[in-house]
Amino acid sequence: MNENLENFSTIDLLNELKRRYACLSKPDGRYIFLGAPGSGKGTQSLNLKKSHCYCHLSTGDLLREAAEKKTELGLKIKNIINEGKLVDDQMVLSLVDEKLKTPQCKKGFILDGYPRNVKQAEDLNKLLQKNQTKLDGVFYFNVPDEVLVNRISGRLIHKPSGRIYHKIFNPPKVPFRDDVTNEPLIQREDDNEDVLKKRLTVFKSETSPLISYYKNKNLLINLDATQPANDLEKKISQHIDG
């Protein structure tokens, strides 16, 4: 038996098999989640990953992983992220391409935080064509700026799983502890009001044209992302499942 599997109880393994079996009845899908930081993309991506067995590709997570390697490039990426700026297009595309080729992405994927601009969207389209596949839809998470600031400034994250909490709107059962593992939660260095305002400025100037780009391709699905997370999850599933 694989040593990794020995770390899990039989009940946990059976529940995981049951979840994956249920995914077989769900449609394959390739989607982009488009929205500003704090719009709810990450939470809904994890929900869809669990219910449909799609792989969740967050370029933010990919870049943070690179930043933590303490290499010269990693330190450069870390500084760029903390300043609220964007990383080189070609490097991000290479990271995405590498992940899309993994077995976890065979049933489908959710691109969270990529593409950020029309040039990246065109590069992604070429990459998907090369891999003989295409997008099924682009969900746009629409949230006013003032709501985004409130959400981000109180965000807490369980790094190993990606579970997201909020100090006020979705607090953990035990302060600063993950509900499932009881491991400590963190607040990202770039989750503060000053950095967020810079990120929102960048988002509006670089990313907003994507709304028109994908609308013209009849791929855009506009969501009111101020509604409760459970209601938003149902809306997304309705679009995907038909």
Curated annotation (Swiss-Prot):
pH dependence as annotated: Optimum pH is 5.5.
Compartment(s) where it occurs, according to its Swiss-Prot or TrEMBL record: Cytoplasm
Residues at which AMP binds: 59, 64, 85-87, 113-116, 120, 199
GO biological process per UniProt: generation of precursor metabolites and energy
Annotated GO MF terms: adenylate kinase activity; ATP binding
This enzyme's EC code(s): 2.7.4.3
Pfam families listed in its UniProt record: ADK (PF00406), ADK_lid (PF05191)
Catalytic activity from the UniProt record: AMP + ATP = 2 ADP
Residues that hold ATP according to the record: 38-43, 155, 165, 229
Region (NMP), start-end ranges: 58-87
SUPFAM superfamilies associated with the record: P-loop containing nucleoside triphosphate hydrolases (SSF52540)
GO cellular component, one term: cytosol
Chief location bin: cytoplasm
Source taxon at top rank: Eukaryota
UniProt-listed PANTHER family: NUCLEOTIDE KINASE (PTHR23359)
Function of the protein: Catalyzes the reversible transfer of the terminal phosphate group between ATP and AMP. Has very low activity with CTP, GTP, ITP and UTP and no activity with GMP, CMP, UMP or IMP in vitro.
Stated family: Belongs to the adenylate kinase family.
Protein name, entry field: Adenylate kinase 1
